[in-house]
Amino acid sequence: MKEIIYIFIGGGMGSVTRYLTQIAVNERLSPALFPFPWGTFAVNIIGSLLIGFFYSFSERFNLSFELRLFLTVGFCGGFTTFSTLANDSLSLLKGGFYGIFTFYVFISILLGLLAVLAGGYLGEQFK
């Protein structure tokens, strides 16, 4: 039960942070640029970097299981959003933005994987 509480708190914090980040990114980029889900893209790439970092860092410093759950399953799980990526992609398709759709899906997956690798590398650099 203790693990569920850590995940619950981390997830809530991650969700609120995602919401605020998406608003900030969308206010700065979306009106001026072509129809691209910048906020969702940003949180998913940042979240991928963070989860790579948290996993690597927690292994390196032997963080408690509960703290690992809080950071990865909770915070990163709440911060990132695959469902919104899928919904944004569908909106691009329905809007006839086929090129942007293809680019968005491809670059989200590619940069997400690269961000996890980069985060893992950064986590290993701490001494």
UniProtKB/Swiss-Prot annotation:
GO terms for biological process: cellular detoxification of fluoride. It catalyses: fluoride(in) = fluoride(out). The chain crosses the membrane at residues 4-24, 34-54, 65-85, 97-117. Its main location: membrane. It is found in: Cell inner membrane. GO terms for cellular component: plasma membrane. Keywords: Cell inner membrane, Cell membrane, Ion channel, Ion transport, Membrane, Metal-binding, Sodium, Transmembrane, Transmembrane helix, Transport. Pfam families: CRCB. InterPro entries: FluC. Na(+) is not transported, but it plays an essential structural role and its presence is essential for fluoride channel function. GO terms for molecular function: fluoride channel activity; metal ion binding. The keyword ATP-binding does not apply. The keyword Cell division does not apply. Na(+) binds at residues 77, 80. It is a multi-pass membrane protein. Fluoride-specific ion channel. Important for reducing fluoride concentration in the cell, thus reducing its toxicity. Belongs to the fluoride channel Fluc/FEX (TC 1.A.43) family. This is Fluoride-specific ion channel FluC.
